[in-house]
Structure formats: C-alpha cells, structure tokens
C-alpha cells in the first residue's frame, strides 16, 4: 500500500504587535527567542541554527546573523515593538541587541536577567592554557 503523503504544517500568521525578546548569550552560543506577553514562543534562532559551528558560534557576528533571522520571522507575524531581556556572559549580547534595533523594532525596555548565585554550586576548575 502506498504511503500517505506527509502534510507540510504551515505556521499560522498571528497578529501580535508587541513581544519580548529573550537573548541568551553563553560562552559557546547565542540563542534569541521572541515570545508574546504570555511567554508563548513566536520565533527563535541561534548561532548554531544559522550554520556556525564550533568557536564561530560564540562570535558577535554569529549573534547578529541569528538576531536578523529571528526578527525577520517575528515581523511576519506583525510584531513591531519589543522588550529585550538579556541573559548570560557571552560576547553576543550587544550585537544581538543592535541587530534587533536595526531590523526596525521599537525597543521599549532592556533588562539584564542574568542569574547570579548567592554562592551556590561549586564552579568548574580553572582553565590553564
């Protein structure tokens, strides 16, 4: 018997005017997720999904390319204004933020939501190069 043709599921176009951009910049990668006010994901991208591998993922340029990609996806849903939440110590924080502003979004607020331990887990060993 012939296989049933697999259906390609299209993203339905939502009309959301404003949202929250979560920029998570680690030492190895930068992920950017755009959500609505309730926290439902609308679009996401990362340096890894944009084709960067290894140490190139942690560069500011990779974060910029990922931010341009996610902004294109979010603007298809009619998004115009963003609140930006930046987390992590990585080098892609500022460049991702600049790329979001350059893509035509109105950034209403920028918050640093990096978690800081109150002397929690023991850190990993010192790196000797």
From Swiss-Prot:
GO molecular function: rRNA binding; structural constituent of ribosome
Pfam families: Ribosomal_S11
Classification via InterPro entries: Ribosomal_uS11, Ribosomal_uS11_bac-type, Ribosomal_uS11_sf
Lineage: superkingdom: Bacteria
Keyword annotations of the record: Ribonucleoprotein, Ribosomal protein, RNA-binding, rRNA-binding
Gene3D superfamilies membership: Ribosomal protein S11
GO cellular component: ribonucleoprotein complex; ribosome
Keyword field contains Hydrolase: no
Keyword hit for rRNA-binding: yes
GO biological process: translation
Record's function text: Located on the platform of the 30S subunit, it bridges several disparate RNA helices of the 16S rRNA. Forms part of the Shine-Dalgarno cleft in the 70S ribosome.
Subunit note: Part of the 30S ribosomal subunit. Interacts with proteins S7 and S18. Binds to IF-3.
NCBIfam families (alphabetical): PRK05309.1 (NF003698), uS11_bact (TIGR03632)
Family: Belongs to the universal ribosomal protein uS11 family.
Identification of the protein by name: Small ribosomal subunit protein uS11
